[in-house]
Amino acid sequence: MTGDDIAKIRAIMEMRNPEFAERIGISRQHLSDVETGKKPVSLKLQAKIFMNVIDTPEYRNHLRRLQNLTLQAKLS
């Protein structure tokens, strides 16, 4: 997982930096540093993102909605 991957996950969730950082239990600055590549993505951070974001019904619903929009755009 890279900082860019984390930024994409945050975008899928339609969350701003402060909200996402709070959800995964890190500071806004740390999240920004990770997303921009200034700090590495640790295994501990990956686990926090998985447990608090990816492995949730909310994330799956957002992802499903985006997939449906993409499919509709391709069919148009």
Predicted feature locations:
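DNA major-groove recognition helix of helix-turn-helix/homeodomain DNA-binding modules
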Residues: 43-62
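Hydrophobic alpha-helical segments, especially transmembrane helices
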Residues: 11, 29, 45-47
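Short, charged recognition helix plus adjacent turn
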Residues: 57-76
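A short, Lys/Arg-rich alpha-helix, primarily the initiator
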Residues: 1-12, 50
